[in-house]
Amino acid sequence: MALLCGLGQVTLRIWVSLPSQSENGIGFLAARAFLRSGGMEALTTQLGPGREGSSSPNSKQELQPYSGSSALKPNQVGETSLYGVPIVSLVIDGQERLCLAQISNTLLKNYSYNEIHNRRVALGITCVQCTPVQLEILRRAGAMPISSRRCGMITKREAERLCKSFLGEHKPPKLPENFAFDVVHECAWGSRGSFIPARYNSSRAKCIKCGYCSMYFSPNKFIFHSHRTPDAKYTQPDAANFNSWRRHLKLSDKSATDELSHAWEDVKAMFNGGTRKRTFSLQGGGGGGANGGSGGQGKGGAGGGGGGGPGCGAEMAPGPPPHKSLRCGEDEAAGPPGPPPPHPQRGLGLATGASGPAGPGGPGGGAGVRSYPVIPVPSKGFGLLQKLPPPLFPHPYGFPTAFGLCPKKDDPVLGAGEPKGGPGTGSGGGGAGTGGGAGGPGASHLPPGAGAGPGGGAMFWGHQPSGAAKDAAAVAAAAAAATVYPTFPMFWPAAGSLPVPSYPAAQSQAKAVAAAVAAAAAAAAAAAGSGAPEPLDGAEPAKESGLGAEERCPSALSRGPLDEDGTDEALPPPLAPLPPPPPPPARKGSYVSAFRPVVKDTESIAKLYGSAREAYGAGPARGPGPGAGSGGYVSPDFLSEGSSSYNSASPDVDTADEPEVDVESNRFPDDEDAQEETEPSAPSAGGGPDGEQPTGPPSATSSGADGPANSPDGGSPRPRRRLGPPPAGRPAFGDLAAEDLVRRPERSPPSGGGGYELREPCGPLGGPAPAKVFAPERDEHVKSAAVALGPAASYVCTPEAHEPDKEDNHSPADDLETRKSYPDQRSISQPSPANTDRGEDGLTLDVTGTHLVEKDIENLAREELQKLLLEQMELRKKLEREFQSLKDNFQDQMKRELAYREEMVQQLQIVRDTLCNELDQERKARYAIQQKLKEAHDALHHFSCKMLTPRHCTGNCSFKPPLLP
């Protein structure tokens, strides 16, 4: 703010009312509003990368309103940026203190007050309560709600420590290797020792060496360990609870330097606070990346659309969540290169991913290095996914969004931000897409949205990485990842990968719709290309995906690059499918299938599935050069999964009824046409006129044409083109691509079957064994490429197989149905990875004898499909049997449970009766005793009265009163 004002101090004596504000030129409040509205971003930009808010709380402190403490006046109001969030500060007792309540409600809003309080106590941070006057100042400054009754204020250093303990990386401070703190405690007789940070790797680590007996203790135990020296006096430790060592252990050197005492504070803050929910944001971006360094950045990139690299600042500002400012700064810091390729890192967390990303954008790397997570604005799902190795967790939902990323929320950021950053970003993306860092430039010529593989892909993928860095990184990561992990959506295949096609009828229907959708998508793609990724619904996926999906899985990662390739929106916008948004594929796979028939509105469909679809189908088709291959490659995976059904529908517009034939025969021509238009390499597809393709341009085509159409399905045509480019396209996939290419030629019906089997085990969906699955799958797919349906079918099968576990969208029955239709769909759009492989092969073949090959493929596919159908029927029966046995077991259990409950009720009744009887008896006994007591009491009373009251008789009486003393 100070910077904003250009004044060294934006000190507002809020009491002075507004005048003082106006004195500052930009009122404090006004400035604050400005910051809130995005001024921060501007600010950070001005500050320069170094200062961005992002790098660390410290780097932010520069936003402090005042310069020196000497200038601090009592109750002077200022604003400090903590982790990029403006926090109101007040000078109390000559010290600038921040409003803890405001910090809790902004930076730490994901934590409960309890957690925050406990952590604060554990860190030994004391809160200063403000006076009513100060509270009023804070209210007027907007830090506290009007209804607040009290507010604790902590120093900036304490606020940084508190936030760092929640949001910061869990890393020990950088200290010399053999460094040790000389510590003492005064519990009981007291003791002193050396606290060795290097040994402090868990809360119970024996890291303190006693200075007297040289034994090692954990901090918790050390405070209970004391040596009675002659001059020691016994002190009863107060509150020696599990957290107390931080209070009792002190540096023996009272005059330690600030640096040392801060390091000590940081060390004490480690392993504090029980379960530490790291902010997702950090993880999201960073986690994926290298977890810390590029963590924040990655997240920024992902969330902010990476800020689109250079354009990040402006771009980000628009849609970004709170962390936007950081992100922005970060990205900017990262420099146009693009944030670290969160994409790569995120995607695989491979070494390449981690370092590659940074590499691509040196600055990106730097920015990425931000250790502190950007404000954890992103959705909760983020971090986790990005952090997890995707392979292990196939996405439970069909769509990445499942993660709770709020696609809508981030969409603009992801989609818009990245695309906007498109050019810069784009170029990077292009590079990645192309399969080379060099690809960047090529990509850059593409429309911003599409151009950047990342940009385009990002649209859908939610800006994977930020810009060039991302692409380059993506490419590298993709390549690395590809080798390591197949490009298939294996990681989150379950969700989207299962391309549960809609029912056959629906498919044909959907196909028509798909065609329309494809057209819409194409338009969207064009828009996206123009730089309006948002429009594409891909953006939605992107948003969720961008942050989530991309990081989510290598497959996403691969996809990203592929998408990027495929994303060359250089293709005519209409033709160019939307940048393939890999994420959508994932989610789309099942979703599209299920709902395709339902969505009649082409535009809506395009928006909903188009992006994904296009991402799949179009992605590959779109990517004209190698990039396309790459994109297609990945896309196909997803395509095959999500797009497959969708695309198949789309292409099937013509051949709705017979997906197989249509896919390869009918679709082919269209696809070819569209593809050719879309990509120079698409000639093989060449069959269809743009018209059909346009409808679903690449999307439709891809979806429609197994391989022939766009890459979605077979990517056949496209993949073929890719054959040449596959290396580039597949660079991300590297070996896989090569293998695929090789295999593609090999593709044979058996492959399809094999592919199926493989898939069943892991399948792209399988995820856990992506590499293994991938190769075989790819192989099979390649072979099945020959059999258009084969591969698709195989892919289908796998997804199907996995479907039960992975696909949330379909019931087992549904699954079976989908599987049944799947083969058809698959044939229609064999976009599965296999598809891509076989697609390339098929495409290659198609180039020469598209129709002939297609016929063969059709026949083969049919056999394969029949096999698959039988397998599916068996599987279905098996599933039904299992379901029946489960049902029976459940019913038995219920009966047992009921019997048990009845028994319990009876026993309770008995117990109750028994207790009631006992109570009655007790009552009676008590009553009897009371009666007896009463009688005794009366008798006594009577007796004593007689004794004490002598009778005075008149007249002669034999009674003689006792002699009283």
From Swiss-Prot:
Known tissue expression: Present specifically in cerebellar Purkinje cells (at protein level).
Biased composition (Pro residues): 571-586
Skewed-composition ranges (Acidic residues): 654-663, 670-679
CC annotations in GO: cytoplasm; dendrite; neuronal cell body; nucleus; transcription regulator complex
Composition bias, Basic and acidic residues: 800-823
Family: Belongs to the SKI family.
Role: Acts as a transcriptional corepressor of LBX1. Inhibits BMP signaling.
Subunit composition and interactions: Interacts with LBX1. Interacts with SMAD1, SMAD2 and SMAD3.
Protein name: SKI family transcriptional corepressor 1
Species of origin: Homo sapiens (Human)
Lineage: Eukaryota, Metazoa, Chordata, Craniata, Vertebrata
